[in-house]
Amino acid sequence: MSALITHDRSTPVTGSLLPYVETPAPAPLQTQQVAGELKDKNGGVSSQGVQLPAPLAVVASQVTEGQQQEVTKLLESVTRGAAGSQLISNYVSVLTKFTLASPDTFEIELGKLVSNLEEVRKDIKIADIQRLHEQNMKKIEENQEKIKETEENAKQVKKSGIASKIFGWLSAIASVIVGAIMVASGVGAVAGAMMVASGVIGMANMAVKQAAEDGLISQEAMKILGPILTAIEVALTVVSTVMTFGGSALKCLANIGAKLGANTASLAAKGAEFSAKVAQISTGISNTVGSAVTKLGGSFAGLTMSHAIRTGSQATQVAVGVGSGITQTINNKKQADLQHNNADLALNKADMAALQSIIDRLKEELSHLSESHQQVMELIFQMINAKGDMLHNLAGRPHTV
């Protein structure tokens, strides 16, 4: 408060008037209320403390896992869209600046912006086409490798098939030759006839298979005729083998039994004459032993020859059969590999067809984008031309009527 100065009073010393200064009255003391203190009805401070309003119900609620997941997804979407939002904000700021400048500038910048967006979309489509083209080229390279493997397997299958045919023909011819020898020598006529029949059936089976490969016999007929001929060939081979081994064993037993019976009868006859003439008995025993030795030697020689012939024929058949079985197994393995490679090749062709369809679709979309971009640019040019015509008409009107 400023002091009040008056000139009404004078001093007795000089008689001149001196200014009178009034001092302000002291202000009454007031007690300040501290935040949080409550007064009662008499004006005193209450000691109950601060009374706050009850919290809202939303404060006591807890966030569930679903809400947390939604918030997380929202944050991720915001993060992903940050770059796009920045790009859009830049475009919007540019458009806003040119909007405030002039309509013509805005239209020009709008056309440039649309053109840039179309170029970006076109670049994306071209990148997709290039990526799919690279994948297609990789598939083509894989298919070429598969084709080479298939060709090599086909050559190996052809070679193994030729080897199997050679062994098959050799087995059939050997069976016919050995059977003919057995029939001609009289060692085993029945078994030899069976071997000849088995060889003939084998050659017929090979001829039928060759005709089927050449296309002279249909596949449906071969499905029925092939197993029948094979079964007949196997049956005749088994029968001829059993008869060969069985005939040799029975013939050996019969020869041995006959020779033993003859020797026993000779010894009994010479023993009855022993009481008459000792010299004659000695001579008869020596003659009988010599005759028995001669006959047994001839019999064993015949048995050895027949056994050698049959053993040789059977060994030849076994060797040829083993070779034929090995070549047939190799041929089946090569054919299985060839079928596997053909399946892989067909799968790769299907993948290539799918990729080609995707590339064709992208090309169509790219052409549609080019057409839409051209339409938008034509529309913008029409708008600019229409505005130019309108301004020209306005400029050509008279100022006064």
UniProtKB/Swiss-Prot annotation:
Protein's job: Component of the type III secretion system (T3SS), also called injectisome, which is used to inject bacterial effector proteins into eukaryotic host cells. YopB/SctE and YopD/SctB are inserted into the host membrane where they form a pore and allow the translocation of effector proteins into the cytosol of target cells. Is an essential virulence determinant. Required for YopE and YopH translocation. Shows membrane disruptive activity in vitro. Interaction with the host cell triggers a signaling response, via activation of the small GTPase Ras, the MAPK kinases ERK and JNK and the nuclear factor NF-kappa-B pathways, and production of the proinflammatory cytokine interleukin-8 (IL-8). YopB/SctE-dependent signaling response is counteracted by YopE, YopH and YopJ in infected host cells. YopB/SctE is directly responsible for signaling and its insertion in the membrane is important to activate the signaling response in the host cell.
Source organism of the structure: Yersinia pseudotuberculosis serotype I (strain IP32953)
Lineage of the species this protein comes from: Bacteria, Pseudomonadati, Pseudomonadota, Gammaproteobacteria, Enterobacterales
Residue spans crossing the bilayer: 176-196, 224-244
Subunit: The core secretion machinery of the T3SS is composed of approximately 20 different proteins, including cytoplasmic components, a base, an export apparatus and a needle. This subunit is involved in the formation of a pore, called the translocon, in host membrane. Interacts with YopD/SctB. Together with YopD/SctB, forms a multimeric integral membrane complex.
Keyword Transmembrane helix: yes
GO cellular component, one term: extracellular region
Domain of life of the organism encoding this protein: Bacteria
Disruption phenotype: The mutant strain displays a wild-type phenotype with respect to in vitro Yop regulation and secretion but it cannot translocate YopE and YopH into the target cell cytoplasm, fails to elicit a cytotoxic response in cultured HeLa cells and is unable to inhibit phagocytosis by macrophage-like J774 cells. Additionally, the mutant is avirulent in the mouse model. The yopBD mutant can secrete YopH at the same level as the wild-type strain in vivo but is unable to translocate YopH into the cytosol of HeLa cells.
Sorted UniProt keywords: Coiled coil, Host membrane, Membrane, Plasmid, Secreted, Transmembrane, Transmembrane helix, Virulence
Family per record: Belongs to the SctE/SipB/YopB family.
Record carries keyword Iron-sulfur: no
Membrane association type: Multi-pass membrane protein
Signal sequence region: none
Coiled-coil region(s): 129-160, 345-379
Stored InterPro entries: BipB-like_C
Localization: Secreted; Host membrane
Protein's recorded name: Type 3 secretion system translocon protein SctE
